[in-house]
UniProtKB/Swiss-Prot annotation:
Protein's name according to its UniProt entry: Large ribosomal subunit protein bL21
MF GO annotations: rRNA binding; structural constituent of ribosome
Known function: This protein binds to 23S rRNA in the presence of protein L20.
Ribosomal protein recorded as keyword: yes
Lineage summary: Bacteria, Bacillati, Bacillota, Bacilli, Lactobacillales
GO BP terms, alphabetized: translation
This protein's encoding gene: rplU
Quaternary structure (record): Part of the 50S ribosomal subunit. Contacts protein L20.
PROSITE patterns: RIBOSOMAL_L21
Family the UniProt entry places it in: Belongs to the bacterial ribosomal protein bL21 family.
A single Gene Ontology CC term: ribosome
Keywords, in A-Z order: Ribonucleoprotein, Ribosomal protein, RNA-binding, rRNA-binding
């Protein structure tokens, strides 16, 4: 059974495995740099370790592959018969990270 981990990043929990590419909330670092996730909630595999609230000494190491923005989300508010409308767009920034190692 392959080793996996559940990490907390950007206010979310993400299940990761070695070699997997994940999309997370923007991390302020350059593409190609290494990032370490210290908030590991669970490490699974042959023996599962559940943290209370995090697993002590466990880290997940990844490499930032690219920074980008998601597709545009358009919101439109409209009041009928009043000539009132408002259109607003938003593109959420993200970071693509490739997981290199799970250290338990």
């Amino acid at each position: 059974m392959s080793t996996y981990a559940i990490i907390k990043t950007g206010g979310k929990q993400v299940k990761v495995e070695v070699g997997q590419a994940i999309y997370v909330e923007k991390i302020n670092a350059e593409a190609g740099s290494e990032v370490t996730f210290n908030e590991v909630v669970l490490v699974g595999g042959d023996k599962t370790v559940v943290g209370t609230p995090v697993v002590e000494g466990a880290t997940v190491v990844g490499t930032i592959e690219k920074q980008g923005k998601q597709k545009k989300v358009v919101t439109f508010k409209y009041k009928p018969k009043k000539g009132s409308h408002r259109k607003q767009g938003h593109r959420q920034p993200y970071t693509k990270v490739v997981i290199n190692a799970i250290n338990a």
